[in-house]
Structures are given as C-alpha cells and as structure tokens.
Amino acid sequence: MNEPATRIPFGDTPPTRCAFYRRVCDLPAHIDPPELGRIVVRAEHIAALVMPSALGHAVHADLRRCHRHDAVPAIGPVLAHPRSGRWTFLIRPDLPDDTALFTEMFRLDISIARPGATLALPSPTDRGEHFRRWLHLPHNPFRPSGLTVLDSLRACTARTGWLRTPATGPRP
C-alpha cells in the first residue's frame, strides 16, 4: 500500500496551510501569533502522545506492521521535532485520565497532551525542517485510538526494555 504524499497540496503560506489542516484533516488550526506564522491547534477533539524519536520510530514500525494484518488503519498523523528528538502521534482523546497511566508514561519519558493542550503543527514559516515536520501527513480526519497507540507503545517497550533516557549527555 502506498503512503500518501507528504507535501501540502495547497499554496505554501500559513493561511493556506491552516485551510488544508481544517478542511482536509479536520484539525481546527489557526495562526498564533500572526506575525510569526506559527500554526497551532488546540487539542479539543484530539490528543497526542509525545515520545523520544527512537521509541517513536519503533512504535510507528509496530503500527505499520499491525495495519498490514488488520483492516483497521492504525497509523495516523505523526510529527517529528528534530531539534528536541521527539515524535508526536496525534490520537483520539480516549486514553483514561488515570494517575497510573501518567506515571507509567513519565517513567518512559512520554508526555500525554490531553484535550485543552496547544499543539504546534508544521508551518511554511518554520526554518527548514529543524522545528517540525510531518512523518505521516494527515490526508483525512482519521486519528487512531489512543489505546491502539498505547498498546503498540507498551509492546515496543516490553520488547526492548526501554527506559527513560538520561537528561544529560549528547542527544541523537
């Protein structure tokens, strides 16, 4: 199965990119602040899991593998943040509001962006691809269940023995 193209089909300005995010991806994006052209979305009907890129790569591969064996798509929009070495998986907001889950994710260096959080999306005003870029561009309103991504994440950490990376030292 071919992956969708990772380019934005409309012009490359913040207003046209926002229009693409709103119309095609059902992401209520807006420009904030207007003079900088940064595109953000308030997580209302979406949530996100933000994790180290090495773990994100493993989760993405696991979700692709699951998708090949299942009729239900498992991969939704995924963002890379190259400067910070993080990946963001946009998901449905169906993760439980549970202290044990937050503790588990904290130990793995994973953040849960719950409804109400502000998420920055790739913008044509970003300088190169050093800030944010799409690894898996949304081409429709689909976002996987947070529980599906969480299951994949748990499978990957169990297989690899993943632990929180140290805050000091060089970043990949």
Task: Tell where the protein language model's regions lie, with residue ranges.
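Helical (often loop-to-helix) elements that flank the catalytic cores of nucleotide-handling enzymes
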Residues: 91-115
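Signature for HUH/AEP ssDNA processing cores
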Residues: 1-84, 93-95, 135, 139-172
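Beta-rich nucleic-acid/ligand-interaction surfaces
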Residues: 86-88
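A recognition module on extended beta-rich or small alphabeta surfaces enriched in W/G with H and D/E
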Residues: 113-144
